[in-house]
Regions:
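Conserved phosphate-binding/catalytic loop of the ribokinase/pfkB sugar-kinase fold
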Residues: 1-38
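Active-site donor-binding loop signature of nucleotide-sugar glycosyltransferases
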Residues: 1-2, 78, 135, 191
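Structural motif
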Residues: 13-16, 42, 65-68, 103-105, ...
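Conserved beta-alpha-beta core of the PfkB/ribokinase-like small-molecule kinase fold
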Residues: 23, 27-98, 121
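Conserved phosphate-binding/catalytic region of the ribokinase-like
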Residues: 90, 94-208
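A generic local structural motif
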Residues: 9-13, 37-40, 61-65, 98-102, ...
């Protein structure tokens, strides 16, 4: 605690920037301190597309804060454990992933949810459309950064005009695997390196 991200200040330049920015991406830890929490709430008001990468790491989260942020969110990303934890917090029994996602969509009026499933791939829900994709098989060298790279790959296509769910998810699972196959959370690589890897590892949607 008491590090730089606990004391992020609201700046008019940042609020102005968000009016022309494609997305605001944030996690839970950024709101553990009152100063940064207030700033985050102001930023979400200025942003048109809020992406919440949920991190339920005790003791650095508050369920009331999580709910408040989800009400401001257009796209939320959970892992399997976080999905079940969220349902427990809300007194909802787990039935299936699809039922759980639809429940959260309804409660928070949020169309898009991603569930990362580790070695079993990832599920993307956009409204009533569900897309399950496998992981790309690689020799794992470092899993640090794989979740962030998955989301970065997802957004790089999601925010492009004219892309479809297959292109979005292929980019996401490919970039996650590409980073996992290298040492370090932020390995050096070129766009050509990744594009070649992605195009050599084609994937297809899985049955739900």
């Amino acid at each position: 605690q008491h590090v730089a991200w606990d004391y992020i200040e609201t700046r008019s330049a940042d609020l102005n920037l968000l009016t022309d920015t494609d997305a605001l991406v944030f996690g839970t830890l950024a709101a553990r301190n009152e100063k940064s929490k207030n700033t985050l709430f102001e930023l979400t008001e200025a942003s048109n597309y809020n992406v919440f990468d949920i991190n339920l790491r005790p003791p650095y989260y508050d369920i009331h804060l999580i709910k408040d942020l989800l009400h401001r969110t257009q796209l939320a990303k959970f892992n399997k454990a976080e999905l079940r934890m969220m349902l427990d917090f809300m007194g909802k029994d787990y039935v299936t992933e699809k039922d759980s996602i639809q429940y959260l969509q309804d409660v928070f009026r949020m169309n898009e949810i991603i569930i990362s499933k580790g070695s079993k791939g990832a599920l993307y829900a956009n409204g009533n459309n569900f897309h399950l994709y496998p992981t790309v098989p690689v020799e794992v060298k470092d899993t640090v950064g794989s979740g962030d790279s998955f989301l970065a790959g997802f957004l790089s296509k999601r925010l492009e005009t004219g892309t479809n769910a297959h292109q979005i998810m292929h980019q996401a699972v490919a970039l996650g695997a590409f980073i996992t196959a290298q040492k370090g959370a932020c390995p050096e690589y070129t766009l050509d390196d990744f594009t070649k890897f992605r195009d050599q590892h084609l994937v297809s949607t899985l049955p739900l």
